């Protein structure tokens, strides 16, 4: 600072106040001001005295001690004023630029630039903190509804939703998130769309009526939209924002936590065209689709109403932990969850990570180290046979246990050429089997044909081992089998007969190999064709069971005929010996 003030201090103009710093030459003054002698000798030139004054006798210098009592300009100005606002102005100027002169245009532009750059820096690296601070400052009683409308539209970018916030938007700085308290979310064609602040009581009453009155969703004046509709109440939603993701077109949401979700999911108005393809309903990617880095959900209970007069049932989720949740890969991310557990129509289901350690008892044929296990216990079979062709569509009674293992290749598989070759061969064999199933003639697939192993990337394929256990099932011969060939139609009656004769317990094991691209834009088990592939694998398993059962029956007949022939020969030989 002395470099900037030197031209002003050496000016011949005399100032009415003491200079910036006065270093005394007198030992008495140095001891009074507690100034070290070394420092005093180095900067004596900053004194406001003239040369004759410095050479004056000591008695004249002692008279000026009272005028040199204050070290800085700020101290002198603070003593000269009694107004608290003037003192505040002096302190602010001194704190910002270590000077008491008025602000000029350069100072103001520097301050504005500093404020803008610092706020941009905070917004980029601490987006949630910046937004929560803005919300805290403008979240007054009059601005709450306007703020809820703008924030809701910016976060969801969905004009078809009606969202009501009963409580204010509260920034939670302890967890670094923004909290929405008591939220009501609705999607109905006759409900006003928008984001408002209001009461949650209407949503609670609608949810309670839906749980007790089955005819609620069938009322003529309730809804008639051809899409999934819902009325949901949420106790608390915590979100964190990420500016960098928003710039990259991945949505501004970074982490989302949902607690206490209740409501109704109504699909009674959903209709499909005849021979409609589920692939027509895949999500079309758009820049800005959310890609949540971490999704957590706890304490969920919903009532689900299915189309075609299917009975309503409840779906509950105790806790859900997803490492990522992307709108364009929704179903695939759910299958790769860290942990999901709950009930589906009073049937327990779990999705969790399963790891195998490298121990000496590990099966060498197991080529995959990491997997995600999906398990459903004691599920009613009518959830699988609704509108499905194949063996599941023929079964109209019974229960099923399902276990599915989503397999991921080992990280060390790339270094082991033999293991990688086995993985690629497995994928190639499954693809050939799938091609034979859906193609009537395949001339390239013959005894000497082998898949191009080098052209297959294991990371591009989705592998799932399915294990199904059917209990107390009952099947009927379908009236129309337009989706099956003549040869496959000939096996319908044997398969139905086998199911009814072994209805107590039927185990089915199969492996499904699909490309990961089949799950792009998929939200359900149907539009990803996973249900179709599962039904086809179950058909192949039943066909193998029927063939094995026929071979076993033929073998028993031959053994019985041979035993009867042997007994007759022994009897004839005995009669000959007696005669």
UniProtKB/Swiss-Prot annotation:
Its main location: mitochondrion. It comes from the Eukaryota. Residues 1-47 form a transit peptide. Belongs to the MDM31/MDM32 family. Residues 48-114, 579 are mitochondrial matrix. It is found in: Mitochondrion inner membrane. Interacts with MDM32. Participates in a complex of about 600 kDa. One of its GO terms (biological process) is mitochondrion organization. This is Mitochondrial distribution and morphology protein 31. One of its GO terms (cellular component) is nucleus. Residues 136-558 are mitochondrial intermembrane. It is a multi-pass membrane protein. Involved in the organization of the mitochondrial membranes and the global structure of the mitochondria. Also required for mitochondrial distribution and mobility as well as for the maintenance of mitochondrial DNA nucleoids structures. The lineage of its organism: Eukaryota, Fungi, Dikarya, Ascomycota, Saccharomycotina. Present with 1200 molecules/cell in log phase SD medium. The chain crosses the membrane at residues 115-135, 559-578. Keywords: Membrane, Mitochondrion, Mitochondrion inner membrane, Transit peptide, Transmembrane, Transmembrane helix. The gene is MDM31. PANTHER family: MITOCHONDRIAL DISTRIBUTION AND MORPHOLOGY PROTEIN 31 (PTHR31068:SF0).
């Amino acid at each position: 600072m002395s470099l900037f003030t030197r031209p002003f201090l050496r000016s011949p103009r005399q100032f009415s106040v003491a200079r910036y710093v006065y270093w005394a030459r007198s030992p008495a003054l140095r001891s009074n001001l507690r100034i070290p002698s070394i420092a005093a000798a180095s900067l004596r030139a900053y004194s406001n005295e003239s040369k004759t004054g410095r050479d004056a006798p000591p008695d004249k210098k002692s008279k000026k001690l009272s005028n040199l009592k204050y070290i800085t300009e700020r101290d002198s100005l603070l003593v000269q004023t009694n107004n608290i606002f003037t003192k505040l102005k002096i302190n602010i100027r001194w704190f910002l630029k270590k000077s008491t002169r008025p602000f000029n245009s350069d100072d103001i532009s520097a301050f504005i630039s500093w404020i803008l750059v610092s706020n941009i820096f905070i917004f980029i690296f601490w987006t949630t903190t910046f937004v929560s601070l803005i919300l805290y400052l403008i979240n007054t009683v009059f601005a709450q509804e306007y703020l809820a409308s703008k924030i809701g539209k910016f976060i969801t970018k969905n004009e078809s939703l009606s969202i009501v916030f009963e409580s204010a938007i509260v920034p939670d700085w302890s967890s670094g998130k923004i909290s929405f308290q008591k939220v009501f979310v609705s999607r109905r064609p006759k409900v006003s769309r928008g984001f408002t602040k209001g009461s949650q009581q209407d949503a609670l009453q609608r949810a309670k009526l839906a749980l007790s009155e089955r005819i609620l969703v069938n009322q003529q004046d309730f809804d008639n939209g051809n899409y999934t509709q819902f009325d949901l109440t949420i106790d608390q939603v915590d979100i964190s924002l990420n500016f960098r993701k928003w710039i990259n077109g991945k949505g501004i949401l970074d982490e989302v936590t949902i607690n206490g979700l209740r409501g109704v999911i109504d699909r009674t108005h959903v209709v499909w065209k005849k021979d409609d393809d589920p692939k027509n309903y895949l999500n079309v990617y758009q820049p800005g689709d959310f890609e949540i880095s971490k999704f957590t959900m706890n304490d969920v209970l919903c009532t689900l109403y299915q189309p075609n007069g299917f009975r309503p049932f409840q779906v509950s989720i105790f806790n859900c932990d997803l490492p990522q949740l992307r709108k364009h890969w929704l179903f695939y991310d759910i299958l790769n969850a860290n942990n999901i557990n709950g009930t589906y129509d009073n049937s327990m289901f779990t999705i969790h990570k399963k790891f195998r350690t490298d121990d000496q008892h590990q099966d060498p044929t197991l080529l995959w180290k990491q997997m995600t296990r999906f398990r459903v216990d004691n599920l009613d079979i009518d959830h699988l046979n609704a509108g499905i062709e194949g063996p599941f569509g023929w079964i109209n009674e019974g229960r099923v246990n399902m276990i599915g293992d989503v397999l991921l290749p080992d990280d060390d598989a790339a270094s082991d050429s033999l293991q990688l070759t086995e993985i690629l061969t497995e994928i190639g064999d499954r693809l050939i089997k799938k091609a034979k199933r859906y193609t009537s003639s395949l001339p390239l697939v013959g005894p000497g044909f082998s898949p191009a192993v080098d052209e297959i990337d294991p990371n591009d394929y989705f592998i799932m081992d399915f294990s199904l256990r059917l209990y107390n099932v009952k099947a009927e011969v379908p009236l129309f089998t337009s989706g099956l060939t003549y040869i496959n139609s000939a096996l319908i009656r044997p398969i139905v007969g086998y199911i009814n004769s072994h209805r107590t317990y039927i185990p089915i094991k199969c492996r499904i190999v699909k490309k990961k691209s089949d799950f792009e834009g998929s939200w359900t088990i149907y539009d990803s064709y996973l249900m179709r592939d599962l039904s086809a694998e179950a058909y192949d398993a039943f066909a193998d069971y029927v063939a094995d059962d026929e071979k076993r029956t033929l073998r028993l007949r031959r053994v019985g005929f041979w035993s009867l022939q042997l007994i007759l020969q022994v009897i004839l030989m005995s009669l000959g010996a007696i005669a």
